[in-house]
């Protein structure tokens, strides 16, 4: 692969308090990383429980994709990383049943 044909990959990292979109450019020998967007990940507190604001995160995902595709027309793939200790429940038809619950302070204290 020559220097003019770098492959580009879009990655999203959704952390406990913020997230970001990063484009990785790889020429076969060297990987360069460029942050495309960064955003807050603030939970929604309802009835004593912290929930992920999945609609806001979905919006930020779309914003990051648009920004990356505007700058780089030839993105090869997309990857997404989130906290592994939180989860969402899906119905049989694959609809999200409710916003995923963030790990709670009382749960953390038990660990």
Give residue ranges: language-model regions.
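Glycine-rich phosphate-binding loop plus the immediately following alpha-helix
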Residues: 104-111
């Amino acid at each position: 692969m020559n220097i003019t044909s770098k492959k580009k990959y879009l990655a999203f990292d959704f952390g406990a308090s913020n997230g970001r979109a990063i484009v990785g450019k790889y020429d076969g020998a060297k990987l360069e990383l460029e942050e495309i967007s960064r955003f807050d990940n603030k939970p929604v507190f309802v009835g004593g429980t912290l929930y992920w604001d999945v609609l806001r995160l979905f919006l930020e995902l779309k914003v990051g994709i648009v920004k990356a595709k505007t700058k780089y027309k030839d993105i090869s793939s997309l990857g997404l990383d989130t906290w592994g200790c939180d989860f969402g429940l899906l119905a049989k038809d694959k609809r999200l049943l409710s916003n995923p619950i963030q790990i709670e302070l009382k749960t953390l204290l038990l660990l």
